[in-house]
Amino acid sequence: MMINTAVLLIFDFNTNVCIVSQKDLDFSSDVVYEYVSKRLNRIIGDAAQKTGVFYATSAFQMKLQALVDGTLTFDDLASQIARELYQLVSHCDEPESTDLLVIDFQDDDDVRNLGILMLDNKTAYTHQILDDEGTVYNKLIKHYAILPGTAQKAEAYALIRLNDFSIHFVDKKRKMDGEDVYLLPDKLLQCTSVISSKEAVKVVSKIAEKVAEEHGASTVEALSKAKTYLVENAETADSFSPQDLGSDVFGDSPVLQREFEEQVKEAKLPEAVAIEKEYAQKAGRSHKIKTDTGIEITFPSEYIENTDFIQFINNPDGTLSIELKNIGKIVNK
């Protein structure tokens, strides 16, 4: 990744003013480079990203085309984005002071991207050192415009590849005239919204658990099989099919499989969901359960079908026993 340029713009709703910077950020400063690069690295490849396609009538896409063609400068585009977003945020029921970071950068494929990051200001306490006629003293003050730390992900952002105008974004729900809105896709970008891989995995997992529970099947087995499917599928594909996942989890029961497929359709999940291999492996690597007796167990998801290591036994009295096998060593943590 290489950052070409970036600019910071301010939405201050304490004084109701949009401050448009007339200079880009100075990347000769290590502090500036560290903050901007870490912010980008936190969101690139984020599994929570939704994807979108510009509507044919999107005015924003035309501005991007002008940027690519060289008829609109980066600074002019950033200023236009800031003024439009400021107006949108100001019309929200509870406008929050925000710093807007607009970045022009090359990704790891050397494709030019535009990044739009909305950084909500935080209130924090800090110290102030004062000098009163030679007497030095410390004072506690409240700061109303603290930027989120580099370890935090931006709650609202958009990344747009300028070679094909593909969009990846995360946004938070806001209230405008009492109605729920997502400012970035609905108002600024004017684009479609496709479920993120993180959300899709969460939805199919809930459906698998619900179907298993309603039909008296093992929810632990269903969820573990779903996770194993994600890991194995990610080895050869960059997307997964919710329907295929259901076939793999409930392959032994046509009734449960049909029920799963019907609920997937009701949830309006796409036929294929893009998913990063790294996220699939992270999400499917292990499964954690907690018993009503307070015992917690975490085990590799693929072990659910291997009784050499763990076995779930249904007792005659309706209780459940869990047997752990072939343990050579126990480590306290």
Question: Each PLM stretch: what is its role?
Answer:
Residues 2-283:
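Long, hydrophobic alpha/beta structural blocks
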